[in-house]
């Protein structure tokens, strides 16, 4: 009896998670989508309406630029910082790590927007993609640096020591030994950074004023009519397109690395 109740509870929980996904998959192809699940007349008209909206198309391009740039910069910076904190011993290292994790967890979200707005305005970076990328990188760097530090800690130092004995410089050790061994961890944080940047709404909504610079997370508001009522067909189609880059990136990285956290010795 207990097993049957557990099975029913798990099925109900699975259905609760599956229904929104099923709606997202079916609603874009429905001529007149509702909040329920139905697919009476399959059509591509909703996608046609999305690509006719210049703000929506520009938003997708902006999101790709912002997310890719942030992913590349933050991944490299987090890896190099993690390697330094993992391998180098210097005074105050633990204090710096503690302050970074404290600030990244306490000063975030809405509480950080007012000082960020004032800072970007004083630097002349308000309403610019460069300023937004810098904010993204600064916000995502501490957490991903800690993830990478744990990964670098698991890599045996003997590889680097052997390279130094063979005459390699510290820079060569970093580029030829450390970075290749860190690739699985870098892939993991790259996906995390891309997803966080791609899905962020609050930061670009506040720091960007020009509609032509808005990412897709903000541009979706163009599918609300004059009185604020959502146009379900277009929103569903846009949301479907919006998920494709993230899912594609996850599949590529998962097939190549499998999100296995290993160091120098593969398991």
List each model region and its residues.
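A hydrophobic, multi-pass inner-membrane permease signature
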Residues: 1-267
